[in-house]
């Protein structure tokens, strides 16, 4: 209790500042001992988070699905966690480890305050919005070091705008749509059935990308589908049908049925 009390009041530094005889207690003579002030491992505390965070919150024996950090943590947090958990639990504290590269400036240089090339995420959100930053993160191949700067973010903003315009178009084209208007897939024209087949392929690719933690594949597949298969192809072919065919036209109803499936 005396040791616990000392560390509760003084933190880890209590070992260096405390009266060591008081820590030993009256049953031991300090002259028989030599206090050691060497650092065991700077990552020792963080390596024990599996016991004091995960198990404390979710129960003994529970381990993390994923540990996520930069490549430098193979000799840091990943390693200390593995060693401590293997020694005390007989197993790794995680099911998988995901390592990402580092964010560099637009010229591929390491960011440094002294150089003045640090890109502040808060400024990006203030200038462009959080969704632009999220899309940039999702679009980057984190297996390598990634660059970020005004030109890179401009490209991300363009991709975001195209995605948003795709959804805005569908939202407008679906005005007044109801279940009574729906057409069975078997009764749809070949073009609509083709787009639904492409949607099925997209679903398989997106799920595969997420399972593999390759989120850049997810973002690329989604944007390519929206830009090429929908905007430049499907929407362009069917725009006359949407605006010129009668409301009861089966082709128009089939088109809007597919739009409803795509949107939702």
What are these regions (language model features)?
Residues 187-194:
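The feature captures the catalytic groove of carbohydrate-active enzymes
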Residues 1-176, 195-238, 242-243, 257-264:
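Structured secondary-structure scaffolds
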Residues 182-183:
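Generic long, charged, amphipathic alpha-helical segments
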């Amino acid at each position: 209790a005396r040791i616990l009390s000392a560390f509760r009041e003084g933190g880890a530094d209590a070992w260096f500042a405390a009266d060591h005889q008081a820590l030993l207690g009256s049953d031991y003579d300090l002259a028989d001992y030599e206090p050691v002030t060497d650092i065991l491992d700077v990552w020792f505390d963080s390596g024990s988070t599996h016991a004091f965070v995960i198990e404390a919150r979710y129960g003994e024996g529970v381990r993390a699905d994923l540990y996520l950090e930069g490549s430098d943590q193979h000799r840091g947090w990943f390693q200390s966690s593995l060693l401590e958990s293997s020694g005390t639990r007989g197993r790794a504290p995680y099911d998988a480890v995901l390592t990402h590269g580092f964010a560099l400036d637009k010229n591929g240089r390491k960011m440094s305050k002294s150089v003045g090339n640090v890109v502040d995420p808060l400024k990006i959100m203030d200038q462009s919005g959080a969704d632009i930053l999220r899309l940039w993160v999702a679009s980057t191949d984190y297996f390598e070091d990634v660059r970020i700067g005004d030109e890179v973010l401009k490209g991300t903003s363009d991709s975001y705008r195209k995605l948003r315009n795709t959804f805005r178009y569908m939202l407008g084209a679906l005005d007044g749509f109801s279940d009574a208007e729906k057409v069975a897939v078997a009764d749809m024209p070949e073009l609509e059935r083709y787009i639904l087949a492409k949607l099925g392929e997209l679903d398989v690719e997106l799920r595969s990308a997420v399972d593999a933690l390759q989120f850049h594949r997810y973002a690329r597949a989604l944007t390519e589908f929206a830009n090429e298969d929908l905007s430049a192809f499907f929407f362009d072919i069917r725009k006359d049908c949407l605006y010129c065919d009668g409301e009861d036209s089966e082709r128009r109803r089939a088109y809007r049925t597919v739009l409803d499936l795509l949107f939702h």
